[in-house]
């Protein structure tokens, strides 16, 4: 079985199992690609169309690694991000676990495209991220505006523990 075959097989299994998407991926194929690449220790930006990867035969051990993660995803119904302990937002990886929700936010898109910039002025020196969860928006804001002091807070001590890992 090749990498391409395994991604297709994994996507079919996810679709047949009826798992939910939306915690980093929008469909079975994208989630399968993430699952397979993570399980095999390959970069998530691996070009699956590149024949040097896509046609490469996989060992039985590699297929078993993918099968273990796939089974955990289907049986637990947990977002893949919780199983891999990693979520990506605007191209930035964040640690995540069940103590905070998987980051996904329209605000992150606004930060990336600069549509919040007009609301800032030369007098903007501080930003507060309320209900920070895993801290991803605070990190993205600090990256977008390095001259602004960003503070993050949350009522949940568990969520703050996750945020500390990411900042």
Residue locations for each model-derived region?
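Generic helix-packing signal
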Residues: 14, 36, 43, 142-146, ...
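N-terminal auxiliary segments of SAM/dcSAM-dependent transferases
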Residues: 1-89
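SAM-dependent Rossmann-like transferase core, predominantly class I methyltransferases
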Residues: 54, 64-165
């Amino acid at each position: 079985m090749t990498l391409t075959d395994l991604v297709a097989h994994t996507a079919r299994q996810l679709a047949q199992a009826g798992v939910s998407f939306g915690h980093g991926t929008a469909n079975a194929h994208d989630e399968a690609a993430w699952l397979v690449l993570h399980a095999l220790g390959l970069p998530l930006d691996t070009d699956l169309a590149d024949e040097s990867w896509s046609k490469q035969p996989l060992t039985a051990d590699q297929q078993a690694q993918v099968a273990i993660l796939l089974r955990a995803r289907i049986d637990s119904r947990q977002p893949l991000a919780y199983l891999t302990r990693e979520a990506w937002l605007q191209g930035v990886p964040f640690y995540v676990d069940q103590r905070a929700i998987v980051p996904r936010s329209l605000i992150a898109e606004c930060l990336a495209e600069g549509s919040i910039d007009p609301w800032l002025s030369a007098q903007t020196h501080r930003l507060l991220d309320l209900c920070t969860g895993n801290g991803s928006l605070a990190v993205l804001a600090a990256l977008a505006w390095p001259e602004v002091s960003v503070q993050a807070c949350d009522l949940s001590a568990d969520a703050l523990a996750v945020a500390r890992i990411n900042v």
